[in-house]
From Swiss-Prot:
The modification N-acetylserine is found at S2. It comes from Saccharomyces cerevisiae (strain ATCC 204508 / S288c). It is found in: Cytoplasm; Nucleus. This is Pyridoxal phosphate homeostasis protein. Pyridoxal 5'-phosphate (PLP)-binding protein, which may be involved in intracellular homeostatic regulation of pyridoxal 5'-phosphate (PLP), the active form of vitamin B6. Present with 4890 molecules/cell in log phase SD medium.
């Protein structure tokens, strides 16, 4: 698919170098954890929020296919402009009234921030209505491992189990349970300690849920500041933006084209 999106050659050189630098570190850490296994089993999710479509096109032309966005409208607009074999991941705070708009995106691959039964049901219902022939959306349940009030996510066992129950029910056909996701606290992510306790908490939730429901959940944890430790503690995915694209502009100055 030709998008007609052009880009600067200097920016291309810079972005590819930065992407490959991060990829190299991810692979090196993964090989230490997954001995004799393919290090590419760790997904490097490229977080492209507030970055122009031209930056995404550069990395797409380099072979990258999975990108993460934090804002519903931005994801929708970029999905219309960019190749339709991109796998879009929504990783921002999810509002129930935005589930319908998200579900309309045919190549929406994943929603990583399900934090209530109501949102899970609304997303399933909306996908069934607007894109019933597309693949089910892979979903992560967001866990608030740091118990910070300003953070989204569940930490109540009954509520978590209720959401998992729905995903495994006959009713839930258009979205699919993939794993658990967390955003650790800033302070913990910047501590010079051997183990990130927020990540350790997510690992414990995985063990508890897998034991109760017979699942085999994947973990999504780790961003630019703490992805190395996340890999060591068992994540299947790291979400990296700044280390690849550089600093983000203020939201009111960001442009899609």
């Amino acid at each position: 698919m030709s998008t007609g999106i052009t880009y600067d050659e200097d920016r291309k050189t810079q972005l590819i170098a930065q992407y490959e630098s991060v990829r190299e570190v991810v692979n090196a850490e993964a090989k230490n954890v997954h001995v004799n296994e393919n290090a590419s089993k760790i997904l490097l999710l490229v977080v492209s929020k507030l970055k122009p479509a031209s930056d995404i096109q550069i990395l797409y032309d380099h072979g990258v296919r999975e990108f993460g966005e934090n804002y519903v409208q931005e994801l929708i607009e970029k999905a219309k402009l960019l190749p339709d074999d991109i796998k879009w991941h929504f990783i921002g705070g999810l509002q129930t009234n935005k589930c319908k708009d998200l579900a309309k995106v045919p190549n929406l691959y994943s929603v990583e921030t399900i934090d209530s039964l109501k949102k899970a049901k609304k997303l399933n219902e909306s996908r069934a209505k607007f894109q019933p022939d597309c693949n089910p959306i892979l979903c992560n349940v967001q866990i608030n491992t740091s118990h910070e009030d300003q953070k989204s996510g569940l930490n109540n066992e009954a509520e978590i189990f209720e959401v998992i129950d729905f995903f495994l029910s006959e009713e839930c056909k258009y979205i699919k349970l993939n794993g658990l996701m967390t955003i650790g606290s800033w302070n913990v992510s910047h501590e010079d300690s051997k183990e990130n306790r927020d990540f350790a908490t997510l690992v414990e939730w995985k063990k508890k849920i897998d034991a109760k429901f017979g699942t085999s959940l994947k973990l999504s944890m780790g961003m630019s500041a703490d992805f190395r430790e996340a890999i060591r503690q068992g994540t299947a995915e790291v979400r990296i933006g700044t280390d690849i694209f550089g600093a983000r502009p203020p939201k009111n100055e960001a442009r899609i084209i």
